[in-house]
Amino acid sequence: FPVALYEAHDDMVKYLKASGTGKTIAEVAKDIASPDVKGTYDGLVIPRKLPGPNNTVVDAKPAYDAAMKTSRPALQKLYKETFAKNKLDAIVFPTVPKVAIESNPDSSSLANFGMYIQNTDPGSNAGLPGLQIPLALGASSKLPIGMELDGPAGSDRKLIAIGLALEQVFGRLPAPPKR
């Protein structure tokens, strides 16, 4: 979590500069239409903050530095050992712990944000390739319900091949109905 949010700022700034848009990250964020993404950029990415205790925010840099020095290498080691020991090409798990809610200001609250990324956050912070496959639509929300696959470091192409094979098994979902 600290790695992805902290690096989102730098990566977006680099992208905007390299692509020659002439826009700043703040200008791009001003035009974000999705309330949850806008909330994340305005509340966390641009000010370089992370969710803290009791619905507060804290400076991201100390947590990022600690993650890069200690937590990330330990997580990468754990994943590497898990994939090797169990001879796995991928780990499969639900993308999110519950059916997504519609995009609105509450969907980007710190509590909801943390809850919705909790399953995908470890692999992301370890720098692993990940692939999300929509499998069904929620009964009432009609929003996609997905399965996530994380692969060993450097297995991007193999993970895509696995995803394409699974698409043959599960098929493709129709687009959610327009609201």
Question: Would you name each region that the model predicts?
Answer:
Residues 78-81, 110-134:
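Small-aliphatic-rich amphipathic alpha-helix that forms the alpha element of a beta-alpha
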Residues 95:
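Glycine-rich, N-terminal phosphate-binding loop of Rossmann-like dinucleotide-binding domains
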